[in-house]
Curated annotation (Swiss-Prot):
Transmembrane segments: none annotated. This is Immunity protein CdiI-YPIII. InterPro entries: CdiI_Proteobact, Cdil-like_sf. Immunity protein component of a toxin-immunity protein module, which functions as a cellular contact-dependent growth inhibition (CDI) system. CDI modules allow bacteria to communicate with and inhibit the growth of closely related neighboring bacteria in a contact-dependent fashion. Neutralizes the toxic activity of cognate toxin CdiA-YPIII (residues 954-1077). Does not inhibit toxic activity of CdiA from other toxin-immunity modules. It comes from Yersinia pseudotuberculosis serotype O:3 (strain YPIII). Encoded in a defective cdi locus that has been inactivated by gene rearragements and deletions. Signal peptide: none annotated. Pfam families: CdiI (PF07262). Interacts with the C-terminal DNase fragment (residues 954-1077) of cognate toxin CdiA-YPIII. It comes from the Bacteria.
């Protein structure tokens, strides 16, 4: 079955102090990519600059599996990176991400960092960029509870950076919790 579509991903977190745009990579699922980029800015960044941050993060996303497989069809453009899928390293990278933000913005606790934080997932494939808002369910947990597909913001891949930035702001405004 070869219904896998090459995709690129990014994740956006925003609170009252900053917007953080990170590259995510994967194959069907995705996760924070240490080989990607991170952009930090104040929440009042222009739509143009915000859109450029998103485009750059997506451009660094990798279509990647941990290792070659012979038992299933694998998309011909996939690359391989075992470290990206190492669960221990994934936890370490997340902890480093949290620590970096806490130090950079002077937070003393995780609660202060994550208070009122909004999160959007971005997926780019085919001809569309889909920005999905989330619900802040617990301190460090976001999910889709109470959201509908119509809450997603869908843009053409040909959208200008300003349109992408404005679309992200719209999706962030639809975040719950």
């Amino acid at each position: 079955m070869n219904d896998i579509v090459k995709s690129a991903w990014a994740s956006v977190k925003m609170n009252t102090d900053f917007i953080c745009v990170d590259t995510y990579s994967g194959y069907r699922s995705n996760q924070l990519d240490p080989l990607g980029v991170q952009h930090l800015s104040s929440p009042d960044v222009s739509d143009l600059d915000l859109g450029e941050m998103v485009k750059d993060a997506l451009s660094h996303s990798r279509f990647v599996l941990p290792a070659p497989r012979t038992d299933i069809w694998i998309h011909p453009e996939v690359t391989f990176d075992l470290d990206l899928y190492d669960s221990r390293r994934t936890v370490e990278r997340y902890d480093e991400w949290v620590k970096k933000l806490m130090v950079h913005y002077g937070y003393k606790t995780k609660r202060a960092l994550f208070k009122d934080m909004k999160s959007c997932d971005i997926c780019c494939n085919h001809d569309a960029i889909t920005i999905s808002p989330t619900r802040h369910e617990k301190l460090e947990v976001w999910g889709g509870t109470g959201l509908k597909g119509s809450d997603n913001v869908i843009l053409s891949v040909d959208s200008s950076p300003t349109e992408i930035g404005a679309g992200l702001r719209l999706a962030l405004s639809r975040c719950k919790g």
